Curated annotation (Swiss-Prot):
<dbReference type="InterPro" id="IPR000160">
    <property type="entry name" value="GGDEF_dom"/>
</dbReference>
<feature type="domain" description="GGDEF">
    <location>
        <begin position="293"/>
        <end position="426"/>
    </location>
</feature>
<dbReference type="Pfam" id="PF00498">
    <property type="entry name" value="FHA"/>
</dbReference>
<dbReference type="InterPro" id="IPR001633">
    <property type="entry name" value="EAL_dom"/>
</dbReference>
<protein>
    <recommendedName>
        <fullName>Uncharacterized protein sll1895</fullName>
    </recommendedName>
</protein>
<feature type="domain" description="EAL">
    <location>
        <begin position="435"/>
        <end position="689"/>
    </location>
</feature>
<dbReference type="GO" id="GO:0005886">
    <property type="term" value="C:plasma membrane"/>
</dbReference>
<dbReference type="InterPro" id="IPR043128">
    <property type="entry name" value="Rev_trsase/Diguanyl_cyclase"/>
</dbReference>
<dbReference type="InterPro" id="IPR050706">
    <property type="entry name" value="Cyclic-di-GMP_PDE-like"/>
</dbReference>
<dbReference type="InterPro" id="IPR000253">
    <property type="entry name" value="FHA_dom"/>
</dbReference>
<dbReference type="InterPro" id="IPR029787">
    <property type="entry name" value="Nucleotide_cyclase"/>
</dbReference>
<dbReference type="Pfam" id="PF00990">
    <property type="entry name" value="GGDEF"/>
</dbReference>
<dbReference type="InterPro" id="IPR035919">
    <property type="entry name" value="EAL_sf"/>
</dbReference>
<dbReference type="GO" id="GO:0071111">
    <property type="term" value="F:cyclic-guanylate-specific phosphodiesterase activity"/>
</dbReference>
<dbReference type="Pfam" id="PF00563">
    <property type="entry name" value="EAL"/>
</dbReference>
<dbReference type="InterPro" id="IPR008984">
    <property type="entry name" value="SMAD_FHA_dom_sf"/>
</dbReference>
């Protein structure tokens, strides 16, 4: 077969024979195929040669270059846009409105057929005669001359050329007898005479069927040891011999394999990438159409990995990705396919399952494996994996639909936060659309001054005194009104808006404090929650100090709240940052104490001032003795470390009295007050009637 591109543009026309393993196409002079047009990108497309196990050759066209950069216009084949497309004879490639490229696979022998894409296949004429030719490096083998007409001198010269050619040449008859080997063959393949027809170069080259064409040239690739050879097998017409010409293509194969690896594998994890995954998924779906088994697509993400990357750098995050790969690879089956999808997400194709329950059990086992700490330089790091799941045939029957729906399922888990995994559901489509709209509105909310701060009082019930407030963000949407924090806090994290919004919270709360300063005690403090992304931002400390200075707020008025899970992500880095914050006089509080998986020994390590007992322990304290016992132990522990203790979620006086009897002094919750707007908290302070909460 002859493979070629016929380029047709207003400025030039050209025919390019395809012989190499890879071609880059674009307007930049460094490309293999240069098309000097401003309408296309500098590196618009890449053409890759592939040879399957049957030695059939095909060419794939990929949008952009092999480093993942896409073209401006895209690559359009037969009127449809494609990222990666296997070309068949007659395909029309459009790089812009006025540049078309025709792909042709032209038989070089009358018996050859044009094969390929089934319904996609179109037969088109060879257009090369109408265009100027590129320089072709090709040897044409025509009908043999009558050697009897050559002189003895010419015959001697011809024999010498063959005998001393650096390229091996072998001749056999149709009975498998070796009739000629040149010197190069004997040197490169010393065992060929001994192995005879069992030698890789001679195996299967004698036609077995009577209807084999009487004259044709066949090409195949042969691997011998670690070497690759291209063998051209010539069956001359009306001849009793078969001749082979052998060329060493090892270097070319190494380059091809390298290019294939770069195009379809992730260099960090050595896993297949998204392009190869989509190809393999398409093949699996085409083979499973008439089977009763269920396929599962599992998209895995990690809540803290991006923050870890920001805090500790790419090298640590890369090391964690490698460990994740090792763990996942050790727990997937041979028939399953694991790939790195993008960034910190992985995708898994689970095959041959009987039902959704079997897939769910498999996913739960994987997530349990990922809960174990990751040790980097002997320091434990904890990540929380989560997964979206879509299945064939329940949730879709083609590649694009399944990938779209597994992505929607993953976003659902990410937004909810409390779940580790979920299957795709039809209702998620509308939820996904709402999420996109909400995300768009969030980008405008900060500019339009739509965020508000509310404050929940913290009361010392022993003295009946207001000792601080916790700042809580709210969003006043122009259409939907007051939006629940549960609907947008997660989106602030995933979009990265939490960083500028977090700065706005501090700046606004510090400004509001100056309105209250005359009415509060000297130890009154403002508690502000930090998200994982904020805490792991490399410029957190200078940002806080700058805003404190700009607001003229003494550092001891600020109490930074972080959760146990944030503390545990990187012990050494956390300790360094907390020590730095405390050295500037900033107070530190561990939120949701008792709900995570930290070691109690870390209370001795980290310089916290306050522990906050989570509402999950306080809500049933009147009816659950075990909760009361846990809280009493926390209070004893906190007092032993000279820590301030705050109980959250106090909704009625009996709760408060029970906690006070156990030794807790500071509390917050709806019994004292709902979160109050800036105007309401100002009035609350002015009223000053906190003695009604005194239990001492």
């Amino acid at each position: 077969m002859l493979y070629q591109l016929v380029v047709d543009s207003p400025s030039f026309k050209k025919v390019i024979r395809l012989q190499n393993s890879c071609y880059s196409i674009g307007r930049h002079p460094s490309n293999t195929i240069v098309i000097p047009s401003p309408q296309i990108s500098r590196r618009h497309a890449t053409l890759i040669k592939k040879i399957n196990p049957n030695l059939d050759i095909s060419f794939h066209i990929i949008d952009g270059d092999l480093e993942g950069h896409r073209s401006r216009n895209g690559v359009w084949v037969n009127g449809e846009s494609h990222l990666d497309y296997e070309l068949v004879h007659g395909d029309v490639i459009a790089l812009s409105e006025d540049i078309q490229i025709f792909y042709q696979a032209i038989p070089t022998d009358p018996k050859d057929t044009i094969s390929g894409g089934g319904d996609r296949q179109r037969l088109t004429p060879d257009l090369s005669e109408h265009f100027p030719q590129e320089q072709w490096d090709i040897t044409l083998i025509g009908h043999e001359d009558d050697l009897s007409q050559l002189s003895h001198e010419k015959l001697s010269k011809l024999a010498a050329c063959i005998e001393y050619s650096p390229y091996p040449m072998v001749e056999i008859d149709y009975f498998g007898n070796l009739t000629y080997l040149n010197t190069a063959t004997k040197e490169k393949f010393p065992s060929i005479q001994k192995d005879s027809m069992a030698h890789p170069l001679l195996k299967d080259i004698i036609p077995q069927r009577e209807d084999t064409p009487i004259y044709y040239l066949r090409t195949r690739e042969v691997q011998i040891g670690d070497k690759f050879y291209e063998q051209h097998i010539h069956y001359p017409a009306e001849s009793q011999f078969i001749r082979s010409y052998i060329f060493d293509i090892t270097e070319r194969k190494v380059i091809e394999q390298s290019i294939h690896y770069q195009a379809f594998y992730d260099p960090l994890t050595d896993l297949p990438n998204r392009f190869l995954f989509k190809q393999e998924l398409g093949k699996v779906l085409s083979n499973v159409q008439n089977q009763s088994s269920v396929l599962g697509l599992v998209l895995l993400g990690f809540r803290e990995l991006q923050s870890l990357n920001d805090l500790l750098g790419h090298s640590v995050a890369d090391e964690v990705l490698k460990i994740i790969t090792e763990r996942l690879s050790a727990h997937v089956r041979l028939e399953d396919l694991l790939c790195r999808w993008r960034g910190d997400t992985f995708i898994l194709l689970i095959q041959s399952c009987r039902n959704l329950d079997e897939i769910e059990v498999f996913v739960r086992r994987l997530l349990a494996v990922l809960k174990r700490p990751f040790f980097i330089a002997n320091n434990p790091l904890y990540l929380q994996g989560y997964a979206g799941i879509a299945c064939y045939p329940n949730h879709g029957d083609n590649v694009e639909i399944l990938l779209n729906r597994v992505g929607i399922a993953l976003n659902e888990v990410k937004d909810i936060g409390s779940r580790q995994y979920c299957f795709y559901e039809e209702s998620m489509n509308s939820d996904h659309l709402e999420r996109i709209q909400l995300e768009h509105a969030l980008h405008q909310a900060l500019e339009r001054d739509e965020f508000l701060l509310y404050y929940q009082p913290i009361i010392d019930v022993q003295s009946g005194r207001l000792c601080g407030v916790e700042a809580l963000i709210r969003w006043q949407h122009p259409i939907h009104g007051l939006v629940s924090p549960g609907l947008f806090i997660g989106l602030l994290e995933t979009t990265g808006l939490i960083i500028p919004v977090g700065e706005w919270i501090m700046r606004t709360a510090f400004q509001h404090f100056h309105h209250w300063a005359p009415a509060v005690d000297d130890d009154f403090r403002i508690a502000i929650n930090l998200s994982p992304q904020q805490f792991q931002a490399p410029d957190l400390l200078p940002t806080i100090l700058r805003i404190l200075a700009e607001s003229s707020l003494p550092p001891h008025r600020l109490e930074v709240e972080i959760t146990e899970n944030i503390v545990m992500q990187n012990v050494t880095a956390t300790q360094n940052l907390l020590n730095a914050l405390q050295s500037h006089g900033i107070r530190l509080s561990m939120d949701d104490f008792g709900t995570g998986y930290s070691s109690l020994s870390y209370l001795k390590t980290f310089p916290f001032n306050t522990l906050k007992i989570d509402r999950s322990f306080t809500k049933d304290i009147l009816h659950t003795p075990k909760d009361a016992a846990i809280i009493q132990a926390m209070l004893l522990l906190g007092n032993g470390f000279n820590l301030n203790i705050i109980a959250e979620g106090i909704e009625e006086e009996p709760q408060a009295r029970c906690l006070y009897d156990l030794g807790c002094r500071e509390m917050q919750g709806y019994w004292f007050s709902h979160p109050l707007s800036e105007a309401e908290i100002t009035a609350f302070l002015a009223e000053g009637n906190f003695q009604r909460f005194c239990l001492g």
